[in-house]
């Protein structure tokens, strides 16, 4: 059961007990082979999506968000208090997770205990859209406690300039170890019709740990800058070439965990056309540290293009080739990677929408030319909107590295906003042998692996909104 109560005209309390927090749409497949950093999956559950913009802190690069509610896997209850009083906007989120994943390699048995999440956030409005803010988070999980606190700000000295910064400190105790770490980031931006400039510096201690957040790594200090100049070939909206923008991106840093320096230089040209068209041509080169070694990274050439070709068709695509790293934990090596991606949105009428995306990645060992992997991921989504209430959606996804296909069929009827009924059916297929023997068992040559259904599911989900 869920409810919403307006305490005052500006303060609202949302609560839920034993909710069905299952998603009605599967996460999109991504290439997972040879990824150094974790993949980010956005929140799709309504309770956590509503009003969560408040909990974001100022313009981080390494930290995607300070409160990533996908960390709360299976909530027993949730409560959220949000509101505005004068110039102060605040929010408090509290939830108990029934099946959390353990952090700190303490063992799978800890995953059976509940984990309590508590987040407090407040911002104070200054002039225009400037603000100063603070955040406090606390998680408790079977003897392990993680605490984080800090502040952030955004100020705009002029219409073309902005300065943003944040500082966080964390402390983690699991009964045997007590660790503490800090993180800080400062960003300056300048943007006019002619020039665009960004400079950012950030630092993360090796022992920085914020359980509620999503960030890529810790234990590094780095700085980067992006500079772009815009040229407008001809005034007016009818000329096909709207803007030409040469740009350069440069980054330096030191990774204390991987024990090495890093640098990266990317430069190129960006063209903007009518019909939301754009074309990029870039080249980049850099060094990246991994397990005490420094490897070459970058792209000899990278191309990207996209356009709203006609009213009912939008497409995009890109490709690049260059040096890369095979991120093996024992024996990493230098390689070369060829990658490409493409997609389109087709909407021939007001009812039908077809989305398609594809990603392909190939990696070869540089010293021998040996092919290490060749991966393709395809995602297709077809939606038919019969009217403003009723839709049917079919989603199919394919991952060649995992040899699996996922299909989802969903029918959804929304009576009024907040009152909706879902019915869905999903299947997961994986390629393998159907004789029951291990995959590496010796078999006759004519026996081939086939895709077989590993999981099927049928679900019904309804929500009802009652206003008092």
Language-model features, listed with the residues they occupy:
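Outer-membrane beta-barrel channel domains
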Residues: 1-242, 251, 255, 283-288, ...
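Exposed, low-structure sequence patches enriched in small/polar residues
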Residues: 74, 168-173, 177-468
